[in-house]
Amino acid sequence: MSAPSEPRAGRTKGLVVDLSKAGRTKIRYPAELVRDDGVRVTVRAPWAAPGARDFGFVRFEPGDVLTEHYWRDRWFAVKEVRTGDGRLKGWYCDITRPAVLADGVLRVEDLDLDLWVSADGAKVLRLDEDEFAASGLAGRDPAAAGAAARALDELEGLARTDGLTALLG
């Protein structure tokens, strides 16, 4: 576990988020370290993919800002998504292996399962369960597959109560 750190007032600390999937880097992008308490790492970054991406239930686009919460002891990441002018769109939650921060790189392995929670909390959508089943993780690493499934259930339970905002508070 790396030591807790918090940028001093007026100073920011940069790092790189390296999101991998099935052993390959999916995307790498620079982010500003907001807080690191030794367990949870919070970063802020603009939408990093080229152009807009419409998921049907939300549209991510240039100018959006994501405040991303990663845990060293939990199997998920929660990304608060806001427009450039600060309007909350919702929370995109990735099921991941616990995050590792070393040498300025935050490494996160995406395990296919996702959860979307709308800004008003009215929509809670489980996503990509078919991709997860097709990934073969349950056969290769049953313990990880079980942890991922439990993490999705935990996040959904938090999202359907006031638990998600309490978790991020």
Report the location of each language-model feature:
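Charge-rich, low-complexity N-terminal segments
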Residues: 1-65
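Short acidic, glycine-rich loop/turn motifs
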Residues: 18-24, 47, 82-84, 97-99, ...
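Short acidic-glycine loop/turn motifs at beta-strand connectors
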Residues: 36-39, 84-85, 118-122
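Short, well-ordered strand-loop elements centered on a beta-strand within folded domains, enriched
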Residues: 41-44, 87-94, 122-130
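A short, polar/proline- and glycine-enriched secondary-structure boundary/capping micro-motif
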Residues: 52-58, 103-104, 135-138
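Phosphate/ribose-recognition catalytic cores of enzymes acting on nucleotide-derived substrates
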Residues: 56-100, 106, 111-113
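A hydrophobic, small-residue-rich beta->alpha segment in the mid-to-C-terminal subdomain
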Residues: 111-154
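Cysteine/selenocysteine-centered motifs that mediate thiol-based redox chemistry or coordinate metal-sulfur cofactors
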Residues: 151-169
